Design a protein with these regions (language model features):
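A short glycine-rich, His/Asp/Glu-containing loop-to-beta-strand
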Residues: 35-39
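Charged, amphipathic alpha-helical segments and their flanking helix caps
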Residues: 1-31, 42-130
Length: 130
């Protein structure tokens, strides 16, 4: 596993309801492409097991962001409901890909992200190791 292979594989998972998938954070978004998914903020941990510098377990973290809708579009209740639906869809996609991607755990949250405008966004922090 490498940073690149994990981020690329995670970016390629299919999440029900996502219209557009990016391989990197987009510089701008079109409402016609929403919900849109992209990776962000990869992290890595490499521990040394002994004094001979044997590498330990390779662990990587990447956040997947799913941009739902601009804040000024729709009502808060409708946008919140869309976020809940997308949380379920993303959770199902991560469950389906746990073995293939060596996923250890994930956590998800709703947040606001700015791409010119502010958007309702779901962010999953996905951890994997091998």
């Amino acid at each position: 596993m490498t940073y690149t292979s994990f981020v690329n594989a995670l970016s390629a998972i299919r999440v029900a309801g996502v219209k557009r998938q990016y391989t990197a954070p987009p510089s701008q978004l079109s409402s016609a492409d929403l919900p849109a998914m992209h990776p962000q903020l990869p992290e890595h941990t490499q521990e040394v097991i002994n004094l001979v510098s044997s590498p330990g377990m390779f662990a990587v973290v990447c956040e997947l962001a799913i941009v739902i809708k601009a804040n000024q579009q729709g009502t808060a209740a409708a946008n919140f409901a869309e976020c809940l639906t997308m949380l379920d869809a993303l959770n199902n996609a991560l469950i389906d890909n746990t073995s293939a991607l060596n996923i250890d755990r994930w956590s998800m949250r709703q947040t606001a992200v700015e791409y010119g405008d502010t958007y309702w966004t779901i962010v999953a922090r996905v951890e994997a190791s091998e």
